[in-house]
Amino acid sequence: MEKEEQLFRKRIQELAENAYSRDIPLHTDFLTLAEQTVFQNMSATLPPVKFVLSGGFPMSERKVLCFLASYEEELYAPPFVCLKIVPANRRFAEELTHRDYLGAIMNLGIERAMIGDIVLQDGNAWAFVMEKMSRYLAENLTMIRHTSVVTGITADFSELPEPEMEEISGTVSSVRLDSVIALCGRLSRTRAASYIEDEKVSVNGAVCTNVSLNLRGGEILSIRGIGKFRFGEPGNLKKKGRTSVVVYRYK
């Protein structure tokens, strides 16, 4: 186990113990997919305190882990907000990317862990950030590259677009990683195994070289040079022992 993971586990353990013993709500900053996986793997060893993993919308990847106080379980309020960022003048607006928005926010001195998902559509952006940073960003995030923008805090998530995805369905001999990667990339199983062994495949943000890893459903899979996918829930068992599955490719 790497030192970074050991420190993360220790921090989560301390948060859970404090939340449970003092009956107070405590939370992390935004966690990566890999950190969320570490937490899920250790959750059974933590004190019996209720928790919420939330990133602001169902398809979010970066999420905040909140340990709840007993009195707060029905009144949970996330410690983050959503910023809506729009061009001040669309006529002169550039075509901006996720990297442009993230870079502009971090150039204001905001650490990556303070920033959740950033969703783009039609020249607008929605960025989830920790609440303690929101007022500063609303006042100071006025330029993305060479485009003047207006930044405000919004509670209206109805406009928030869902990621565009291509549905890929098929059957696999098992829900092992190599079988699912073969379906995602339209590869032979042997070729898929080579991608995995060559460290070209990530599962929930962490490089995975275990070709026989069994997937549960909901994992984010990245294949270098091919794309990013979300694995759906395994379906029914078909003829000849094959399992029907659906994966979604991010466009």
Where are these regions (language model features)?
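Ferredoxin-like alpha/beta domains used as RNA- or RNAP-binding modules
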Residues: 1-178, 184, 207, 214, ...
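Basic (Lys/Arg-enriched) interaction patch that binds polyanionic ligands
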Residues: 174-225
